[in-house]
A protein has these predicted regions:
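Metal- or metallocofactor-binding catalytic centers and their adjacent structured scaffolds
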Residues: 1-128, 140, 489-501, 507-514, ...
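C-terminal (or distal) subdomains of carbohydrate-active enzymes
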Residues: 15, 94-642
């Protein structure tokens, strides 16, 4: 159940940003103790909100919660708790950034009724997808704050919605940046002129903030995206007062997108991916994306919340009319969007140097609320000679090889994927990174398949007492990443463990820790802000991840103490992949970090090792000046910042 249900709620967990809130709160707490003016920071109230959010997230990990094996009304209660936690964590993030980003801390003034910032997305109820707010522009610059939750310096593509296409974006250094303007669509073919999506590449410090400025100008240098819409009854030119939109008939010709790393071919009939050419070696790789349905058996025992009992192999997803296909060509990204009856499928290619240009962003908005005993899967077929072997991650930490066995029934060959799954042969590895946990299989050589949603009408006699009919419209987000392998040997294929490449780890980190955009709540009269806030002296090593920096509760009451838990994880990675020209803005240091060089604005007063759960300190625990960790280890330290 965990891997196939409640995808909407799992998507919400990603949006919870509980780690970002914990880290920002810990830094804001230290900042607030530095002067009298900043002591009005609502540290106790926010600590209570953090604690409650932590408990709600923990509750949702219950074996009948995240698995979807609860009655409908119980699921609504879980969803409502998550929804409240998201609201509360947003408040903690906003309050914490307020105190950290002010240039003159003496001007700090906390007013509970008017927040200093607002997030760029709103969610109307616990069972709906969030949507972006529209930022109103004037000739006066409007601050756009971008928070980078990863511990490495980052170049990331950021999109926000604004109310005017005459836009200029200034970087934290005050220089104009290249902007792409894309249409915001109502449905498949109608352009909304109430909002415009602007996209640019942001450069952000590790765990830090960059303050960009948006303003309306008479003549904008932003580049408009062009659109081709493939549909049955097409008129040649579709008049629009801003965008160039061509309407075409669905055709047997391919749709082509490319950037400096790869070239992609899509079918002109279905809009689905067919082939990738990697420019590094000039090779073509067949890469067919398709959808498929699973039914359930005609026996007495049928699929339900616990059981997957398919009626044989999946049937291809057949559409009588070709879908509407909308192709966007832009300076920063191009994309192909296919509108099928049950799924809106988007493949986006970023035309940027570095990490984001090297993988394909795939998103599916799935709606099977009108179906009867059916399950929808996305399948990727390649010519990789995977020999029935594929790899999935356990809890985002280790990767485990899986073997598809023909002697087992189909359902026994489906495995959980928490953050990634891959197949490989001597020359290449194809990784599917995921932002939500799902079930994955590799039923044929060179194939990966992900089950996206299930709708089952009957109970399967395991104690739930109902079917699975509370489906929601769900967003699934993936990254598809093809890499070359060097110097592999045959014995390695039989090893019991495998590791992602460094680039793969970073791609997964970008996907699971997206940049958080915010704007100032007031249009004018905003006090002066720092142009950037960088709490770390430099990027952490590429293989080091700050799992959390969490303020420890005081022993007396539900209020914060002056200590925090710094939890670090050193990732294991496979060296048989090139790291040259990958756009990684960090290095590796064999797991060593100098403590006094860690933080920039704050001084480390003490750092002592503790057990993972902070319950125990070793008897010889003393103040460390250097952190030294082996690969694949997680360590917890008690840290005091000043």
């Amino acid at each position: 159940g965990f891997f196939l249900f409640l995808n909407l709620y799992k998507y919400l967990i990603l949006l919870c940003n509980s780690r970002a809130a914990e880290i920002l709160y810990s830094l804001a707490l230290v900042q607030s103790s530095k002067s009298e003016k900043t002591r009005v920071f609502p540290s106790v109230d926010n600590y209570k909100l953090l604690t409650e959010a932590r408990r709600n997230l923990g509750l949702f990990q219950h074996h009948d919660a995240i698995t979807g094996t609860s009655k409908d009304w119980v699921v609504v209660d879980y969803g409502t708790r998550l929804f409240h936690s998201i609201m509360n964590l947003k408040k903690v993030i906003i309050d914490s950034i307020h105190i950290l980003i002010l240039k003159d801390k003496g001007a700090y003034n906390y007013d509970a009724s008017t927040p200093f910032l607002k997030m760029d997305d709103v969610q109307s109820s616990q069972d709906s997808l969030p949507h972006k707010t529209v930022i109103k522009l004037t000739s006066q610059p409007r601050y756009l704050l971008l928070y980078n939750p990863t511990e490495q310096e980052r170049f990331s593509v950021v999109s926000v919605n604004v109310n005017s296409p005459r836009v200029k974006v200034l970087s934290p250094l005050g220089k104009p940046v290249t902007v792409q303007i894309s249409a915001v669509w109502n449905g498949a073919t109608t352009v909304s002129h109430e909002a415009y999506q602007i996209t640019f590449v942001a450069h952000l410090p590790p765990l830090g903030l960059g303050v960009y400025q948006l303003l309306e100008v008479q003549s904008s240098e932003a580049v408009l995206a062009d659109y081709d819409i493939y549909m049955r009854n097409s008129k040649q030119e579709k008049p629009d007062r801003l965008f160039k939109i061509k309407e075409l008939q669905n055709s047997v010709d391919n749709i082509i997108l490319e950037n400096s790393y790869m070239k992609l071919w899509f079918s002109g009939m279905s809009g689905l991916l067919e082939k990738i050419n990697t420019k590094e070696d000039g090779k073509n790789h067949p890469m067919k994306v398709e959808f498929a349905w699973y039914g359930t058996t005609s026996n007495r025992d049928k699929s339900g919340a616990y059981l997957f009992l398919p009626d044989g192999d999946a049937k291809p997803y057949i559409f009588t009319d070709p879908p509407i296909i909308r192709v966007a060509h832009g300076r920063i990204f191009s994309e192909v969007v296919c509108f099928f009856h049950h799924v809106t499928h988007t493949m986006r290619l970023y035309k940027v140097q570095g990490l984001e240009g090297q993988s394909l962003e795939v998103s599916n908005i799935v709606d099977i609320r009108g179906e009867y005993n059916r399950e929808l899967a996305m399948r990727i077929s390649s010519d990789i000679n995977s020999q029935n072997r594929f790899y999935t991650d356990l809890n985002g930490y280790q990767i485990q090889p899986r073997l598809t066995m023909s002697k087992l029934p189909l359902q026994a060959n489906i495995y959980p994927m928490t953050t990634m799954a891959y197949i490989q042969d001597i020359g290449v590895r194809l990784t599917l990174h995921s932002a939500q946990s799902l079930g994955v299989a590799s039923l044929k050589n060179g194939q990966l398949e992900v089950i996206m949603d299930r709708r089952l009408m009957q109970d399967d006699n395991r104690g739930l007492g109902q079917g699975v009919q509370d489906n929601k419209i769900t967003a699934n987000v993936f990254r598809l990443h093809l890499e070359r392998r060097y110097g592999t040997d045959v014995n390695e294929e039989k090893a019991s463990v495998s590791f992602p490449s460094l680039l793969s780890h970073m791609t997964s980190s970008f996907l699971n820790h997206p940049v958080i955009p915010m704007t100032t709540y007031a249009d004018s009269g905003v006090p002066e802000l720092l142009s950037t806030f960088s709490p770390l002296t430099s990027s952490m090593p590429c293989d080091m991840h700050i799992v959390n920096l969490r303020t420890i509760q005081s022993k007396v009451d539900i209020e914060p103490s002056d200590e925090a838990a710094l939890i670090l994880h050193r990732k294991g990675f496979d060296c048989k992949f090139s790291n040259r020209d990958m756009g990684l803005v960090c290095s590796t240091t064999q797991g060593k970090i100098k403590v006094h060089k860690l933080f920039n604005k704050f001084r480390v007063e003490s750092l002592t090792p503790a057990s993972l759960s902070l319950m125990h300190s070793p008897p010889d625990a003393r103040n460390l000046s250097e952190i030294n960790m082996s690969s694949m280890e997680i360590n917890t330290f008690r840290i005091r910042l000043r």
